[in-house]
């Protein structure tokens, strides 16, 4: 076979094996050096792919797809800075244990570090943020195709093994890059006959169950049985089953459950929004848990960590399914590397339900105060009322993606827990960046196969503006709600706001760009409701149309700060005197 035929077969084998390993969705950015890979994907009828003019957007789209499916999307790009544009998404995927596969085309050996065009050091470009990084040889009959297949299988396994994360395969190609049908009778291809006929992967792998050890469960059951004021914290979870199991355990034992938005259970009607209570210092001093079991990873708000720093529990236990360190305050006394669902199941019946610690009247009163101060239909729609209305209307068959900074905090704090079934919610909280949010939400929606609402701030929106090109299609529509306070409002809540006269200039970065013009540029419908009543009606209708829509909610940073402070001032007395026995 000539070089064209060898390269064509080489890439066809890679793509086919990825599909057989259930990594059959490809995010491709056009380029010359990646021609063999791109055409191998396009030529395989089982491959699903989407083209992306921007590699950075493609990387975040793949991240969102992984969040929805638990499987890696495959990124394909040409050589040079193309692969470097994946870096932010790779970092987020690594930090939050999301699978991802990067296939970067590269120049051959003789074109590296000699001044040749579009050639950089691509091998191991992502450093410590990959689970595995490997450079394949240039296509050639000296390399057995069996070794190519087993390498692809190992890449998928490393991406999915705990902790899941990105894997990078760098693939050098020599010109000519155009395809040519290979000779199936060539001796080099002969060992593939059985594999081709089977339709099965070259090799399989079994994922570990990550059951807790009997000894650790005995210890944990004893701690809970002896605890006087236990507390469960549900942080970010890798799947819905974990969150539901933890919620069921908390209910059966009567243990208060601080459920973060990333846990997947915060919006459930069975969930108590302890975030509101933990804002109040008097409540925190009175509550003082002695045993805390933290299921999963990060939480959005600072309230629980600050409370536990002031009143350290006797035992702080972390339950996670992978060995990554999670001890940001260096106060963890026991770590269980196991599935949260498995641990929750093993703890059932370890004690009688905890008496008291309910505060039902307080939470009912707090809910009424929030609705009265922020959500009356005639009032202007705000950064507090918008997430509360969204959480109350988005139901089964719909999903929610929330951007970082204030949208995440306000949804976590003020969302209405009314969903009859846990609403699928996702955030990029691995490193909590504001970049690539629209792209991630679009990938999340595509992976779920569900229409999705994105709640996002104006700076995050502008940061990923070109991703709006992903929305003008009829499938998996995205409702984008832009909370436009003309800058970074979160800085108004930070100590720096009172310590400098350069808040706007150096931190808030005021902007006056037109959200409406951006929507028009990308052919997306646009609306700008003024009141809560208008927004409620508009959003309820949007949920039924199955069409992408950008809703701009205009806000003033000073008024937003005042509303947050006024609301907290009204809520504080409720929890200062809360009767936790009811």
UniProtKB/Swiss-Prot annotation:
Classification via SUPFAM superfamilies: DHS-like NAD/FAD-binding domain (SSF52467), Thiamin diphosphate-binding fold (THDP-binding) (SSF52518)
EC class: transferase
Single biological process term from Gene Ontology: menaquinone biosynthetic process
GO MF, one example: manganese ion binding
Annotated keywords: Magnesium, Manganese, Menaquinone biosynthesis, Metal-binding, Thiamine pyrophosphate, Transferase
InterPro entries: DHS-like_NAD/FAD-binding_dom (IPR029035), MenaQ_synth_MenD (IPR004433), MenD_middle (IPR032264), THDP-binding (IPR029061), Thiamin_PyroP_enz_TPP-bd_dom (IPR012001), TPP_enzyme_TPP-bd (IPR011766)
Cofactor binding note from Swiss-Prot or TrEMBL: Binds 1 thiamine pyrophosphate per subunit.
Pathway: Quinol/quinone metabolism; 1,4-dihydroxy-2-naphthoate biosynthesis; 1,4-dihydroxy-2-naphthoate from chorismate: step 2/7; Quinol/quinone metabolism; menaquinone biosynthesis
Stretches that traverse the bilayer: none
Catalytic activity: isochorismate + 2-oxoglutarate + H(+) = 5-enolpyruvoyl-6-hydroxy-2-succinyl-cyclohex-3-ene-1-carboxylate + CO2
Names of required cofactors: Mg(2+); Mn(2+); thiamine diphosphate
Source species, domain of life: Bacteria
Biological role stated in the UniProt entry: Catalyzes the thiamine diphosphate-dependent decarboxylation of 2-oxoglutarate and the subsequent addition of the resulting succinic semialdehyde-thiamine pyrophosphate anion to isochorismate to yield 2-succinyl-5-enolpyruvyl-6-hydroxy-3-cyclohexene-1-carboxylate (SEPHCHC).
Subunit architecture: Homodimer.
NCBIfam families: menD
PANTHER family on file: 2-SUCCINYL-5-ENOLPYRUVYL-6-HYDROXY-3-CYCLOHEXENE-1-CARBOXYLATE SYNTHASE (PTHR42916), PROTEIN PHYLLO, CHLOROPLASTIC (PTHR42916:SF1)
Name the UniProt record assigns to this protein: 2-succinyl-5-enolpyruvyl-6-hydroxy-3-cyclohexene-1-carboxylate synthase
Gene, per the UniProt record: menD
């Amino acid at each position: 076979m000539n070089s064209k035929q060898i390269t064509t077969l080489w890439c066809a084998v890679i793509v086919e094996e990825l599909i057989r390993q259930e990594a059959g969705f490809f995010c491709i950015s056009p380029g010359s050096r990646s021609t063999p890979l791109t055409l191998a994907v396009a030529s395989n009828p089982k491959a699903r792919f989407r083209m992306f003019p921007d590699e950075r957007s493609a990387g975040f789209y793949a991240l969102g797809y992984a969040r929805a499916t638990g499987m890696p999307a495959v990124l394909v790009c040409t050589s040079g800075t193309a692969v470097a544009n994946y870096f932010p998404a790779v970092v987020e995927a690594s930090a939050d244990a999301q699978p991802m596969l990067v296939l970067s085309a590269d120049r051959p050996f003789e074109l590296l570090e000699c001044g040749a065009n579009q050639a950089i050091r691509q091998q191991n470009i992502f450093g410590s943020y990959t689970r595995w990084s490997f450079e394949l040889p240039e296509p050639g009959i000296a390399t057995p195709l069996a070794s190519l297949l087993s390498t692809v299988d190992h890449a998928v396994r490393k991406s999915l093994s705990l902790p899941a994360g990105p894997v990078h395969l760098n693939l050098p190609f020599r010109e000519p890059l155009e395809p040519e049908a290979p000779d199936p009778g060539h001796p080099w291809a002969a060992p593939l006959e059985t594999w081709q006929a089977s339709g099965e992967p070259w090799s399989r792998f079994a994922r570990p169950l990550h059951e807790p050890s009997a000894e650790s469960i005995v210890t944990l059951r004893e701690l809970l049985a002896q605890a006087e004021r236990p507390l469960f914290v549900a942080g970010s979870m890798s799947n819905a089953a974990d969150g539901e199991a933890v919620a069921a355990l908390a209910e059966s034992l009567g243990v208060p459950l601080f459920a973060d938005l990333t846990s997947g259970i915060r919006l459930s009607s069975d969930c108590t929004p302890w975030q509101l209570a933990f804002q109040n210092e008097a409540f925190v001093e009175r509550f003082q848990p002695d045993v805390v079991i933290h299921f999963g990873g990060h939480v959005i708000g600072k309230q629980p960590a600050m409370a536990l720093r002031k009143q350290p529990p006797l035992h702080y236990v972390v339950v996670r399914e992978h060995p990554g360190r999670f001890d940001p305050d260096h106060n963890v006394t026991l770590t269980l590397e196991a599935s949260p669902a498995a641990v929750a199941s093993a703890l059932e019946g370890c004690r009688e339900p905890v008496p008291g610690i309910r505060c039902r009247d307080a939470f009912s009163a707090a809910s009424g105060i929030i609705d009265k101060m922020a959500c009356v239909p005639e009032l202007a729609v705000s950064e507090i009322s918008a997430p509360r209305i969204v959480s109350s209307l988005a139901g089964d068959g719909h999903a929610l993606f929330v951007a970082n900074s204030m949208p995440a905090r306000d949804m976590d704090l003020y969302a209405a827990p009314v969903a009859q079934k846990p609403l699928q919610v996702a955030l990029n909280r691995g490193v909590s960046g504001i970049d690539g949010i629209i792209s991630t939400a679009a990938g999340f929606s595509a992976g779920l196969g569900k229409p999705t609402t994105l709640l996002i701030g104006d700076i995050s929106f502008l940061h990923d503006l070109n991703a709006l090109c992903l929305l003008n299609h009829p499938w998996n529509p995205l409702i984008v709600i832009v909370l436009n306070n003309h800058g970074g409002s979160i800085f108004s809540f930070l100590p720096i706001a009172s310590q400098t006269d350069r808040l706007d200039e150096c931190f808030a970065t005021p902007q006056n760009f037109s959200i409406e013009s951006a929507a028009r540029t990308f052919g997306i419908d646009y609306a700008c409701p003024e009141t809560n009543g208008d927004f409620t009606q508009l959003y309820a209708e949007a949920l039924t149309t199955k069409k992408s829509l950008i809703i701009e909610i205009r806000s003033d940073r000073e008024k937003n700060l005042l509303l947050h402070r006024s609301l907290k001032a009204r809520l504080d007395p409720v929890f200062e005197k809360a009767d936790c026995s009811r």
